[in-house]
A protein has these predicted regions:
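Short Lys/Arg-enriched helix C-cap and helix-to-coil transition segments
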Residues: 104-116
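General nucleic-acid-binding
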Residues: 1-41
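Short alpha-helical "recognition helix" segments of helix-turn-helix
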Residues: 81-86
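DNA major-groove recognition helix of helix-turn-helix
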Residues: 97-100
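Short, Lys/Arg-enriched anionic-surface-contact patches
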Residues: 45-65
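Short, amphipathic alpha-helical "recognition" segments used to contact nucleic acids or chromatin
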Residues: 63-77
Length: 116
């Protein structure tokens, strides 16, 4: 049991390290300007206007789908239920689950703030 636990901890540390590396790669590449622009938006209508200019319909649907997958995973839905409800692939569901378990708590923070 201790060997399995140690391997699980090591895998988690590797995943956390990868997640933090991804975050570090984002910094300093114009991302802060994007985040500042998003934070400047004051209404849902402004969000629609900005994201309509910034993203394709498919990109927006993908982002919304990932957030819904995160919400459903937090509520205890199964992969099959999530796939049937959202159309997300098991790869997408797995990636979101990995972020929920080992990421930077971004999904949790956002979903808690919007009451989901």
């Amino acid at each position: 049991l201790k060997i399995v636990q140690r391997e699980t901890v090591q895998k988690a540390e590797i995943i956390i390290g990868v997640t933090n590396m991804q975050l570090e790669k984002l910094k300093g590449k114009g991302i802060e300007q994007l985040f500042e622009a998003i934070l400047s938006l004051e209404t849902i209508e402004e969000c629609y206007q900005f994201f309509d200019d910034l993203c394709t319909v498919n990109e927006m649907q993908s982002l919304a789908q990932r957030l819904e997958v995160a919400r459903m995973l937090r509520k205890g839905f199964t992969y099959n239920q999530i796939e049937a409800e959202t159309g997300a692939s098991t790869a997408t569901i797995s990636r979101v689950k990995r972020c929920l378990n080992y990421g930077n708590d971004g999904y949790q923070m956002a979903l808690e703030r919007i009451g989901k």
